């Protein structure tokens, strides 16, 4: 078997008809976790429904439908392999909650794959149409997804087919606008593909002899290749933040007979070990971790990315809840935020937002109403330069620095210290109206909280 491949996460973005599903479906279909039987079943259904041209989007539609219905399908279906990596597609924007997911992200994407359609008139539509394409790329960048690959799709439907001129025109245009957002085009692989026919997906295409391959220049090592799969293989591997202090936002807290209280969540930074004394914020409860489990197996340590359950002593289910954050009591323990300063981008709000606006924030696993206490400055959303001091209101498209105050105790961190706890979605009217990253947190000095007997004992023993 040799060494296990590194796991990486990608997010696929682009306009609604750019062919994201077909392209993604193709990769999953050819390199992925879908077994022969499932594919044959899909093909048979497709034929019966007269969707003989089934190909790949159908695979994805089936998976999506199951995901939407809340059937937890085998997540391996959303995985595929390159020669170096196991790749998981953490989301594709067809989903209703795409933006929210991307922010409260069950996980951070290591790379975004932007699909643009080269077809006549299609590219223009995707880029202008209140530019979903721009919106997604801007979001990816704002939320810290610094690596980008661009797939110029549907090369088979250009005029004439596989037109070099059309491809070059698109590369030029896309380079210009990703540069405005903050990406450096030299570090981005551009690949002309057809997700439908398979051109340059896994094998170099015979239809584009003019394409001499993609090249990227970056300080961590240059790379070149021809296909989309090779470009994915050249993503720089993520550095998982094991050296930071522990932060583990709770997803749930269970009471398990014979064991006791078991909080469950994903380690975002740091390491969780049995015997550690942890503090939960904002409730300010400190206790000892008796054991740590993943998939019903005891672990000697849990690392960033691991979804774990851990048993804590002398803590009742009433003491801690979803949205609380666990950390090491001796190493920068998490604290309640009295307030925080954030940079927000208003995405779609029908009216005007002024000081006093109090929507719900989704930040890590917390879901809490927060007040826009003060609109400090309006800024250029790309460069971050100040445009105006103390604006009276904000509307769609604006970016601003805002002071926020949570309506109930909550624990958040600055994006630069703990990225997963420093980005949030602003929800109102059943949609994401804004996104933000936290610049600074005003932490509440914790009074004497509850320290359990086992924690006192563990601390004495040390």
Curated annotation (Swiss-Prot):
One of its GO terms (cellular component) is cytosol. It is found in: Cytoplasm; Nucleus; Nucleus, Nucleolus; Cell membrane. Residues 153-156 are annotated as: G4. One of its GO terms (molecular function) is GTP binding. Translation elongation factor that catalyzes the GTP-dependent binding of aminoacyl-tRNA (aa-tRNA) to the A-site of ribosomes during the elongation phase of protein synthesis. Base pairing between the mRNA codon and the aa-tRNA anticodon promotes GTP hydrolysis, releasing the aa-tRNA from EEF1A1 and allowing its accommodation into the ribosome. The growing protein chain is subsequently transferred from the P-site peptidyl tRNA to the A-site aa-tRNA, extending it by one amino acid through ribosome-catalyzed peptide bond formation. (Microbial infection) Required for the translation of viral proteins and viral replication during human coronavirus SARS-CoV-2 infection. Belongs to the TRAFAC class translation factor GTPase superfamily. Classic translation factor GTPase family. EF-Tu/EF-1A subfamily. This is Elongation factor 1-alpha 1. It comes from Homo sapiens (Human). The lineage of its organism: Eukaryota, Metazoa, Chordata, Craniata, Vertebrata.
